[in-house]
From Swiss-Prot:
Belongs to the RnpA family. This is Ribonuclease P protein component. It catalyses: Endonucleolytic cleavage of RNA, removing 5'-extranucleotides from tRNA precursor. Its EC number is 3.1.26.5. Pfam families: Ribonuclease_P. Keywords: Endonuclease, Hydrolase, Nuclease, RNA-binding, tRNA processing. The keyword Hydrolase applies. One of its GO terms (molecular function) is tRNA binding. The gene is rnpA. It comes from Fusobacterium nucleatum subsp. nucleatum (strain ATCC 25586 / DSM 15643 / BCRC 10681 / CIP 101130 / JCM 8532 / KCTC 2640 / LMG 13131 / VPI 4355).
Amino acid sequence: MNTLKKNGEFQNIYNLGNKYFGNYSLIFFNKNKLEYSRFGFIASKKVGKAFCRNRIKRLFREYIRLNINKINDNYDIIIVAKKKFGENIEDLKYKDIEKDLNRVFKNSKII
């Protein structure tokens, strides 16, 4: 999995890309000129303490790892956790996040 690392890459996607909302997350995406997709994961301090933010990012990475073959190439994608995600982190299962992200990705036509 290729990740977005530079601040300029994130800013480019925020400013020029599209966004779609889910119950627990939102995605920003934009076409790139590469032969592969790149991903960025964000969980701000509004979501919760460090252990909560890290768990959220691990769940996002796991979703991408399992579904990378379904995702169209040539996209830069940022997945951002909503505050609601952090509030319910102890009650949420991977299946809930998977269902939410599947819906968001299908609506955005990335899958």
